[in-house]
């Protein structure tokens, strides 16, 4: 018998709690998070596989793998998110890595992974911190071309993870953290300032003053987007709805048919984070599944097309 599996697609934003939004929208967001939290805790996963991105806090251009499994991981605590060690399951992580290698995925493995809000915020929303069920963290590069995984590869990875889980008698929750449409001011190697290019290439721990400055710049960018600044790429609720529609009906082929460049053009440079959802959902059977939670709002102050999507399957 194959153990039950569940999927949670969850956007994240470091600006939650930093940039104010309308009280009614705050209540809506908190109510939606409470609903998904209630569903996940009632479902009671025995293992969590979390696919998330990084924002130049743990992975840098000096060595940027498309995907990396962590046997141990520490959250750096950026933007006020929880800091400290994740409750990783190294045996499950290594077994998954071996399975992926056997299925021709040349997967990277980190024995000491650093992660940021791209991982920690999702765990905090559901479990109130980093004290979670046993966890396998999988980093996905979503910012540094040309190594951003393509849609077909994301689907294939998720399907391979699903085959691994077929032989694992544990109720497993797969979380995709990221997206949806958004383009925050994340620097690239095309930046004209060599100091900026160096900062996203070479691993180092920023000072608190540098972190504070980065936070203020991001808060200002959120306010600018909310004010309609033409220099900021707008969110794309229509694109976000199509993405969520495809995953809700269990149709990954509708997403792998998309043009890679169109993701950036239509939804923003950082919308590639949405591929974490595709990886996670592809580990579950195709086709419609019970989906007790779906919620979405475009929230410019957070620079986020913010979505929540929870689906589950029963044992077969």
Annotated model-derived regions:
Residues 164-165, 174:
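Conserved catalytic-core segments centered on acid/base and nucleophilic motifs
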Residues 56-58, 181-184:
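Short, active-site-adjacent cap segments at secondary-structure transitions
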Residues 12-14, 52-57:
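Short glycine-rich, polar/acidic loop-and-turn segments at beta strand-coil junctions
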Residues 158-163:
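Internal active-site segments that recognize and position negatively charged phosphoryl groups
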Residues 46-52, 138, 170-180:
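Beta-strand elements within well-structured catalytic alpha/beta cores of enzymes
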Residues 1-45, 61-156, 167, 187-316:
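Flexible, D/E/H-enriched segments
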Residues 172, 185-187:
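Short conserved catalytic/interaction loops centered on acidic-Pro-aromatic/His motifs
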